[in-house]
């Protein structure tokens, strides 16, 4: 498991000896929030992005919101961001810590700046460290609204506590935006309409789809499509990554 860049290098190095590789790489998950979603869907999705300081490959960093509740979703996301504390890991309490390195911190800062430069609305957070933290690789929980699909923050894996919120008109547009990415690890659906959820889940080009906050159980295969990797870990599918097929004739 690692970045898509690391996965490409591993694949190239394995090619000379024709080694098989199982890659679980980056992601740019979409979280499709319909007007009939449960009351906690928006806050749950935002917290999922900010958890682990955003350093999760399956984080739902693109929140797609049905237009009729877009303003409500934006306000809830801003509230969650403003109430998410950032502090050192040794401090007791409910807060998120720093990102892993200066390289990652600098990358996140550049991508936040790119969102500003490309015209997205910075609704919460922003560049530089949170107030009161003058050193360390701490990133402000950041919310961008009015994001366009062409922007870098909508396409590149940021791997930090940064969420982009985009509106959609109908199912078809939501599916199109969700699939318009080089990645395909995990997508999310929020709706009380089970038939709609099932219909959309079948059309999403990702290795995993989570519906209404129901996490995956132990033994389920974990992995993605496209530049999110190949192969699976977990359950019987994970074990099969280590097996070879053998054909034998004349056995009986």
Regions found by a protein language model. Give the residues of each.
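ALDH superfamily catalytic-core signature
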Residues: 2-148, 211
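Conserved C-terminal structural/oligomerization subdomain of aldehyde/semialdehyde dehydrogenase
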Residues: 32, 112, 131, 138-252
